Regions:
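Active-site gating/metal-coordination segments in enzymes
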Residues: 76-123, 128
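Structural detector of well-ordered beta-strand residues that form the stable sheet scaffold
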Residues: 39, 85, 113, 193, ...
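Short, hinge-like loop/turn segments at secondary-structure boundaries
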Residues: 56-58, 103-104, 130-131, 210-212, ...
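An N-terminally biased module of ancient metal coordination in phosphate/nucleic-acid-related enzymes
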Residues: 1-94, 104, 166-170, 175-181, ...
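Short acidic/polar active-site loop segments enriched in Thr and Asp
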Residues: 36-37, 110, 158, 252
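Divalent metal-binding pocket/active-site signature
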Residues: 20, 45, 107-185, 190-206
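Acidic (Asp/Glu)-rich catalytic clusters
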Residues: 2, 31-32, 71-81, 101-110, ...
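Charged catalytic cores and adjacent phosphate/nucleic-acid-binding surfaces used
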Residues: 1-12, 121, 155-156, 172-268
């Protein structure tokens, strides 16, 4: 089975498309790409419902959409028998775990993606307010993976998206011990996604790095597949490379989510 469990109805330069019909082009693109099931995971920080989690103006200013039409659009598509799952990409905000849990509780998620795009007021993947510029590359890596481990331990998330996002601009440390963060992920029973999105970023490689994935495999961390598509033409892009990476690491199954329960299906 092939899944693509990370995509957005909102193009980065367009308004959030909320009509149910906007789901269909993604489904059609998935079928053409040989993807069996897709999951929509809009950014939580676009929704007014999650605005209370943020304190910095450049984040609260993003929270302009109602969450209900998004949920209803995906649920309606699922009700029509389309192979879609309802997810949300949620930024982990330290010390706001219970509030996050309460804000997300009313909705029928199939799974929740945990992301770390921000450390305090600094950005992991945005050139403005870039974490690595402010604290240096080694400290940025340390802070990022400490926060990712905390996200795993929070119990909020079913899977972690682009798990080594801190490398996005190709800024690296000479060596890094992935053991502690992977141990936190494994102990929490959280999956990680293998994402092809990094191939179109300055780093020009998959998320996560093969060394990271090898440690995940050694700890039996389950995996999903992801394109991080913001438009239908990106669904399933470069999945041949993702599958090659997974098989090289020894993975034979992929994680499928339904109502926040998971099961393993043969990969491919």
């Amino acid at each position: 089975m092939i899944v693509d469990y990370h995509m957005h109805l909102r193009d980065s330069k367009e308004e959030l498309a909320l009509e149910t019909l906007t789901v269909d082009p993604f489904v059609e693109a998935a079928h053409a790409a040989g993807v069996d099931e897709i999951g929509f995971t809009e950014h939580g920080y676009y929704f007014k419902h999650l605005a209370p989690l943020w304190s910095v103006p450049y984040m609260t200013e993003r929270c302009v959409y109602d969450i209900e039409p998004y949920v209803e659009a995906v649920v309606a598509a699922r009700g029509r028998g389309l192979p879609v799952k309802l997810g949300l990409e949620v930024d982990y905000v330290p010390d706001r775990e219970e509030e996050t849990r309460e804000l997300l509780a009313p909705y029928p998620w199939d799974y929740l993606l945990g992301s770390v795009h921000f450390i305090g007021e600094l950005s992991v993947d945005g050139e403005e307010f870039l974490l690595a510029d402010a604290v240096g590359v080694e400290e940025a890596w340390r802070l990022y993976f400490e926060t990712l481990a905390a996200a795993a331990r929070s119990g909020l998330f079913d899977s972690l998206s682009h798990p080594d996002l801190v490398k996005i601009f190709g800024l690296r440390v000479a060596s890094f011990d992935y053991g502690p963060v992977v141990n936190a992920i494994a102990d929490a029973g959280v999956a990680v996604e293998v994402s092809t999105a990094g191939l179109s970023k300055p780093v020009r490689e998959l998320y996560p790095h093969p060394e990271f994935l090898a440690v995940c495999r050694a700890r039996d961390v389950p995996v999903t597949l992801a394109s991080d598509a913001h438009s239908p033409d990106v669904v399933g892009r470069d999945f041949d490379q993702a599958l090659e990476l997974l098989r090289a690491a020894g993975y034979e199954t992929v994680t499928v989510f339904d109502q926040r329960r998971r099961r393993q299906e043969p990969l491919g």
